[in-house]
Amino acid sequence: MTEPVDGDTPSDDDRRRLAPPLPAGWRWGFPIFLVVALVWAGVLLVDGLSTVLDSEGGETREAVTDPSAPGFEAFVEQTWSMLVATEDGDGELVQVAVVAATDRAGGGGTILLVPPEVMAQGCEASPCRLVERHREGGIDHVRETVTRLLEVEVTAAVLMTPDRWTSLAGPASPVPVDLPIDLVATASDGTSVVRFPAGRVDVAPSDVVDLLAFPDGADGLGRLERQSAWWAAWLVRVGIGDPLENLPNLELDLVDLMALVAGGSVRLADLPWTAVETDLVSQLVADNGMVAELAVQMFPFPIPLVPGQRPTVRLLNGTGDPSLDSPARERVLRAGVDLAVVGNYRHDGVIQTRVVYRDLALAGAANDLAAALGGGTLFDEKASPVTDLTVIIGADFWSAG
C-alpha cells in the first residue's frame, strides 16, 4: 500500500483497511442488549396497563370473585322465562302460561296461568279480550299483551298445538287429575257425551289439550282451575327423579326450562283475575296490584320491557348481611327501575341507605328511589358509570321500610 501524499484522497478500499475491527463483545453484545431492552419494555408496558386497569384511587385492587366478600359485583343474569300459548285443533287460543325459573342453580320457579277471556287492549273490534288479540295477530299479539300486563319481557314465546303437547307430556303420562264434576261434551248430532268423568281421571298425552280447552262459563275461571290442576299434577310427575328423563329427548329450550322448574319448588299462580259483572256480560279483568307484586316475585332479575326507558340500578349490600339481598332487590324493583348490577359494597358497616347519582339530570329519579327505600341521596361525579344510579343498603334498611 502506498502512503497518500497531501491533497490525495484515500480510496474506499484503503479506508476500509484503515478502520480498526470492532471488538467481539460489541459485535455480539449490542444486538443482544437491544433485544433484551425491547422485550423488557414490552413487559413493563403490559404490567403498567394492568396496574392502571386494576387500580382505583391510586391503590391496586384484586378482582373479587367470592359473592359473599366485600367489593364483589356482577351483572345480573336475567330471569329465564317463556310464554307458552296453547291452541286447540281449530287454532283457537285456549291457554296461556308464563313460566319463569326463579333459581337457575337450584331449580324451581313460578307458572302464571293467564285466561284467554281476560280483558285486553288494542283489538280492532269489541269486546277486546286476549283471545281476540290472538285471532288478530297470533302469538305475537298474545306476547305483547301479556308482557305489557306484567311490565316485564319474557325470554321467548312458544306455540303449543295438540300434537306438540302429546310429545311434551308423553314421557310423564298419564297424569292423574281430580275433577269435581263431569265434563260433558255435545256431539255433532246433538247428543251429550261425558268426555271426562268426575273424580280422578288419568289424562293421556293425546287428551291434554282437550282437557285444557274444555269450555266453561263466560268468565273462564272454572277452566282455569282445571288447567291449574293439570299443571300441578304434571309438574309433580316431571319432577320425580331426573326431570329430563320425564320429558322428551329433544334439544328444545322449553324442555330444558320445564326440567329446571320441575326440579325445584314450583308455585302455580292463577289468582290475579277477577270477574266483574256488567249490564251485558261478565268480564274477567286483571288485578293490577296483584299482577305487579307477582311479577316482582316471579322475575328476580327481569328483562326490561322497553330497554333504556327506566333508570338502571347497581345494588350493593353494605351491611354484610346476605339475608337482606332478596328484600332489597324486591324493594328496588317495586320502585320501577331496571336492575343491572348486584353485589356488595367495598366494606361492611354502612349505616345509612343511600342512592348515589353522578348526573344532575338523574337527581329526580334518585330522590324518588330514595323515598321508596327510605334512604338519602348523594351526588358523586366519580360514581360508577356502569349504571344510572347506585343503591347502597345500610343498617337502617329495615327501619326505613
Which residues fall in each region the model found?
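Non-catalytic, solvent-exposed segments at the cell envelope interface
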Residues: T2-G401
